[in-house]
Amino acid sequence: MLEIVLASQNSSKLAEMQELLRDLEIKFIPQTEFSVPDIEETGSTFVENAIIKARHAAKQTGLPALADDSGLTIAALNSAPGVFSSRYAGKNATDAERIQKVLEALEAADDSDRSASFHCVIALMENENDPAPLICHGVWEGEIAREPRGKNGFGYDPIFYVPSHQRTAAELDPQEKNAISHRGQALEQLSTVLTEAFLV
C-alpha cells in the first residue's frame, strides 16, 4: 500500500483531510508520527507555502508528502489575512483572537463589501527533489458575518457566512462543510488524480 506523509501539525486540519481521503487505498501518516518539526512558512503565496511544507516532510521522512496551505482572503482588507491567516493576530493567538482582529479590521475599513473566500492549496511531492509537485486548489466563496456563530469547524469558520446555506461554516455539520468547502474541493481534485495515477 502506498504511504504518504501528511505534513501538518494541525489536528483539526488532519482530521478533515483524513476523513475526505478515507476511500483511497493509501495509508496517510501524520508527520507527528515521525517527529517532523514544523517549518517556517516563508512563501508569499499559498502554493509556495504548501510546497515548502511538503518538501520538508518528504526530506525528513524519505516518503511522498502531502501538504495543505489554506487561508482566508477578504476583499475590503486587500486580500488579508491571506497567507498570514494563522498568524494574523500573532503567532500564538487563539482562533477567537484572530476572529476578533478580522472583525475589528473590517469595522475600521469600508465594510460595505464583506465578500471573502477561503483558499486551500494542496501540494503532493513524491520526494524532496520533485521538480513538478502535484498542485490542487479549492476556493470557497462567502461573506464575513458581523459576529461569530456556530460551534463546528475551526479557524475562521464561525464568521464565514455561506449565502447558499444561510449559515456560517461553523453552523454546518462536518459532512455539509466537506462537500462544499475549499479543502473538500482541493482534496476531491487530489483524489481523482491519485485514483487515475495509481488506480487506488
Curated annotation (Swiss-Prot):
Its cofactor is Mg(2+). Mg(2+) binds at E40, D69. InterPro entries: dITP/XTP_pyrophosphatase (IPR020922), ITPase-like_fam (IPR029001), RdgB/HAM1 (IPR002637). It catalyses: XTP + H2O = XMP + diphosphate + H(+); dITP + H2O = dIMP + diphosphate + H(+); ITP + H2O = IMP + diphosphate + H(+). One of its GO terms (biological process) is nucleotide metabolic process. CDD domains: HAM1. Keywords: Hydrolase, Magnesium, Metal-binding, Nucleotide metabolism, Nucleotide-binding. Its EC number is 3.6.1.66. It comes from the Bacteria. GO terms for molecular function: dITP diphosphatase activity; ITP diphosphatase activity; metal ion binding; nucleoside triphosphate diphosphatase activity; nucleotide binding; ribonucleoside triphosphate phosphatase activity; XTP diphosphatase activity. Binds 1 Mg(2+) ion per subunit. The active site is at D69. Substrate binds at S8, Q9, N10, S11, S12, K13, S70, F154, G155, Y156, D157, K177, H182, R183. GO terms for cellular component: cytoplasm; cytosol. Homodimer. Pyrophosphatase that catalyzes the hydrolysis of nucleoside triphosphates to their monophosphate derivatives, with a high preference for the non-canonical purine nucleotides XTP (xanthosine triphosphate), dITP (deoxyinosine triphosphate) and ITP. Seems to function as a house-cleaning enzyme that removes non-canonical purine nucleotides from the nucleotide pool, thus preventing their incorporation into DNA/RNA and avoiding chromosomal lesions. Belongs to the HAM1 NTPase family. This is dITP/XTP pyrophosphatase. It comes from Coxiella burnetii (strain RSA 493 / Nine Mile phase I).
